[in-house]
Amino acid sequence: MIMIVFIHSFQSIAGAAAAESNVHKILFALFMPTGACLYLFTMGFGSVFTRHSEPKDMVRNGVRLLVYQGLCNLCYAAAIIICFHIRILLTGEVAGSRELYEANLYSVLTFVNIFFISGMCYLVLAIYRKLEVKLSGYIISAVIVGILSPFTKLLISDNQALNWILDMTFGGKGETSFCFFPYLSYVFLGYVFGKVIRRVPENEKGEFYKKSGTVCGVIAVIWFVGCIISHPSVEKFFDYMLVQYRTPGLLKVAGSFCAIIFVFAVAFGIMPQVEKWKFGYNKLCYFSKQISKMYAIHIGVFWAIAGFSAFYPYNVKECLLWAVAVLVATDLLVQGYMKVTDKIKTEKK
């Protein structure tokens, strides 16, 4: 989540120089092997263990997340509109800011993020569960999606409305931030891994994670180093990773899968030590439970900053400082929201 906030600072409030800086590109490249892939993998993994794993439950979750996406877009637009016009009232309109305002407003109303992807993936999982697809079917589907993704992104239409649908499904033009079809691979593999780990006896899970984490960690390093060698400059490496992050091919899926299993293994290994550190463990549990709220809110905070700043092009140092401020502000907003909702629930009782 911390890395996401830093990257989004460059993607929302940075000037052209900062957005093209090596700092942004390196941050993005380091985040790329996991990031949204890890989130979707964990979603598939968690669907194995949740009590709400029936197809109807998944449909309900999927629809709810799609509604969240729409509400988030409206809230982001409201943040831009309100903050931009407050700025105009205070200082007058900044030259050239109106065009940036209109472009960014259109962007936040039409782009899709992790909520849309998760919602669509839940609906697909519901279909698979309803059809009682075997475990091998999930693996085959993950491979097929990884093979097809580089080709399906070529589906582009001259019709703006149709192209928007194609873009957020397959990722052709890259104007909607994310697209859901290529990410199905991670959801399918997460589901498969959840089924596998469920069959491993509790007293053997440590050894299982140790072996699988070691093998997958080595493969992930080889893959990542191979990507660097085959794209030997920061710019080429960033461009390649950007394309692969949005519309991952089979090799990227395999590399990220190995990186994610390594992360799972490390987390399993260090968790007993983390549990002894009560403050850190409680914070980790808090962020795990509230990550969706933090993800949704921090983007709105960035757009509020952008609007109030009249879309001033911040430099690298300023983006990094704003990222820290947004992290703190987001945490405070989520805590405030939780206190208010808890108070309302208590009063109802």
Residue spans for each PLM region:
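Alpha-helical transmembrane segments and their immediate juxtamembrane cytosolic regions
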Residues: M1-K349
